[in-house]
């Protein structure tokens, strides 16, 4: 490989410049911050080795010193952006904010030890948050390997992730607690309706916020869930696709819910966008705050769990519950494992009595 070194003064120090030729094209690599020419010359072998590595793997020299943060924001999210939901993009920025030790470090200089330290520091987060953010970090390093060829080994592969094997029971209300909660919310009409819908359908908050009147069929007593309402940009909320393919579903609307919705339709002006519940950007947070005043540790999502556990206990059918919730069977089985265990125990009793 044809190459030459030169130096120049920059910002009060010495900048080492390597010019080298790859496939008939001249490229440059630089390293600055040296106090003397001697220091700069001593670094020549390292800079040349880096240039040879670039030439061998085909990496763009302009990306050689790109930081983890810059690569994530300016390349990874730029390339992946069209296929990512706004909320997912926002989570990447939350992730970057939580790992300052990696953000401003060039990707090529990040070691397995650096990533291990970051992973250990993320122990302050919940298991789910830690797992998701580390998955994002790993994906970004993989993208730096292919297609950008900035590095050849993923430093995140050296991390042994901690798995919390402690069984966790989802928070769900009893039937009595559900009725008490509805009584307590009766003075706040929107909160009451959101809770009533969630407890009788298991719909997610975003699905309730995105429910429109043309998706409610009073004749057939069905609700069609084919969209949700959430942030679609930093400044705007709007309709968006449901969480997954399974999320598109039509479910039964029981007689009590049909009556409530019919009465609601007669008393509340229909919004321009046709939404049944005209939520605002603060509705979700305010309702969660109100729910926690009534019972510590619960949220709107607790009402979905409540519906699921009640339906599971009455129907004993995991496939049915998964279809109504818009989840897959594996997710339902894992989330409500304590309740599915009860079903298995009941099945054991039936098996014992067979053919007697």
Predicted stretch roles:
Residues 228, 254-297:
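Active-site/catalytic core of tyrosine-dependent DNA strand-transfer enzymes
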Residues 108, 150-153, 163-183, 233-255, ...:
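DNA breakage-rejoining catalytic core of tyrosine-based enzymes
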Residues 10-15, 20-116, 270:
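N-terminal DNA-binding module of tyrosine recombinases/phage integrases
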Residues 131, 150-153, 157-205, 209-211:
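Basic, Lys/Arg- and aromatic-enriched nucleic-acid-binding interface segment
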Residues 146, 196, 200, 207, ...:
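C-terminal catalytic core of tyrosine-transesterase DNA break-rejoin enzymes
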Residues 77-143, 147-152, 167, 189, ...:
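N-terminal core-binding DNA-recognition domain of tyrosine site-specific recombinases/integrases
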Residues 211-263:
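Conserved tyrosine-mediated DNA breakage-rejoining catalytic core shared by Y-recombinases
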Residues 181, 235-239, 335-356:
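DNA/chromatin major-groove-contacting recognition/catalytic segments
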